[in-house]
Curated annotation (Swiss-Prot):
GO terms for cellular component: cytoplasm. Involved in chemotaxis. Part of a chemotaxis signal transduction system that modulates chemotaxis in response to various stimuli. Catalyzes the demethylation of specific methylglutamate residues introduced into the chemoreceptors (methyl-accepting chemotaxis proteins or MCP) by CheR. Also mediates the irreversible deamidation of specific glutamine residues to glutamic acid. Coiled coil: none annotated. GO terms for biological process: chemotaxis. Keywords: Chemotaxis, Cytoplasm, Hydrolase, Phosphoprotein. Its EC number is 3.1.1.61, 3.5.1.44. Residues 138-155 have a biased composition (Low complexity). This is Protein-glutamate methylesterase/protein-glutamine glutaminase 1. CDD domains: CheB_Rec, REC_CheB-like. The lineage of its organism: Bacteria, Pseudomonadati, Pseudomonadota, Gammaproteobacteria, Alteromonadales. It comes from Shewanella sp. (strain MR-7). Residues 181-374 form the CheB-type methylesterase domain.
Length: 374
């Protein structure tokens, strides 16, 4: 049966176009539309949609308030539409905090002109969120989307991704069963996409100010959003969190968030490292791209890396993680049950690259134990 969708927006044009696009996919069906948050709350309870697309700025009741009420009364996967502005970014992060699972930039021109990429992206996101029921606090997984058309190995060049021996199967673990390896690290990498903002906040807020290593964060996010996200994390965390700037020298206890619309790489400079922020190849689907950052870290730091792949659509991170593992690095993945979308972690785990599959609730403790100086 088709996934039932409720479309919520105060613009009649946007409601109509989103409905048309959703209904073009035989796996999706718009069952109703609403023009404000109050209508959305009522319809969510009465119609039991499997996915809701939600605008933020609406009369009567705004989207953020509607998300809070829906998640309290009848939890439903919600995809937010957000303007590409500083205020829009802050509001979107508030909506994610309230319980929304994902967001898309609200680009009227792309929607109006039937741009193929925009249509496919909207359909993929709605299907990804609608393929499972939502339970709180644990969210059930979805099916991953296809692999990006360009891998980091082809863009960076010179690093084989197929030279390692067949790895052992991934083990599903809880923090209590994870014993620190005693390995000495110089860098922590975390890559994520759908569901990442909430997951990163949950993990990083548990880190002490004296966390012993630099941290590179790669979150699929537009350029207008990453400054607001970095600022929000910095205000919530004991460690410092900043949007990465080209030339940043890596410091322990500091997390560097890859800027949206750019690629973040790292190079070795003596005992530490330095961030390189580049426009990157137009061939890459993702900017920032987890594969790009992971692959550069494999060259710069070799096996002295702990890399974690969190919830997200697609397979970004798999090839970069393969390079890291070939260099001797440790690779972990978020487990299926705690992912918003089990795509990126599944790609790493099913390829035998990840040595541990860890729940989000236990991830911070596990990282801290593994990272401890000993």
């Amino acid at each position: 049966m088709a996934i039932k969708v409720l479309v919520v927006d105060d613009s009649s044009f946007f409601r109509r176009r989103v409905s048309e696009i959703v209904n073009q996919d035989p796996e999706l069906e718009v069952i109703a539309t609403a023009s404000n948050g109050a209508e959305a709350v009522k319809m969510a309870a009465e119609l039991n949609p499997q996915v809701i697309t939600m605008d933020i700025e609406m009369p009567v009741m705004d989207g953020i308030t509607a998300v809070r009420e829906i998640m309290a009364k009848c939890p439903t996967p919600i995809l937010m539409f957000s303007s590409l502005t500083h205020d829009g970014a802050k509001a979107t992060l508030d909506a994610l905090d309230a319980g929304a699972l994902d967001f898309l930039p609200k680009r009227f021109e792309d929607i109006a002109t039937n741009k193929d990429d925009a249509i496919l992206l909207l359909q993929q996101r709605v299907k990804a969120l609608g393929r499972r029921r939502i339970f709180r606090p644990v969210v059930r997984p979805s099916t991953p989307t296809p692999t990006p058309r360009s891998s980091a190995s082809s863009v960076l060049g010179g690093v084989s991704t197929h030279t390692q021996p067949a790895p052992a199967p991934v083990r599903s673990s809880h923090a209590a069963s994870i014993r620190p390896s005693g390995k000495q690290y110089k860098l922590l990498l975390i890559g994520t996409s759908t569901g990442g903002p909430v997951a990163l906040q949950k993990i990083l807020t548990q880190f002490p100010a004296n966390y012993p290593h630099p941290i590179l964060l790669i979150q699929h996010m537009p350029a207008a959003f990453t400054p607001a996200f970095a600022n929000r994390l910095n205000g919530l965390c004991k460690i410092e969190v900043k949007e990465a700037v080209n030339g940043d020298v890596l410091r322990p206890g500091c997390a560097y968030l890859a800027p949206g619309g750019m690629q973040m790489m790292v190079e070795r400079t003596g005992v530490t490292g330095r961030v390189k922020v580049l426009a990157g190849s137009a061939e890459m689907n993702y900017k920032p791209c987890v594969d790009i950052t992971f692959a550069s870290a494999s060259k710069a730091f070799g096996g002295d890396v702990l890399a974690v792949v969190l919830t997200g659509m697609g397979a970004d991170g798999r090839e970069g993680a393969r390079m890291l593992k070939s260099a001797g690095a440790t690779i972990w993945a978020q487990d299926e049950a705690s992912c918003v979308v089990y795509g990126m972690p599944q790609a790493v785990a099913s390829a035998g690259i990840a040595t541990q599959s860890i729940s989000l609730d236990n991830m911070a403790e596990s990282i801290l134990k593994e990272s401890a100086r000993g």
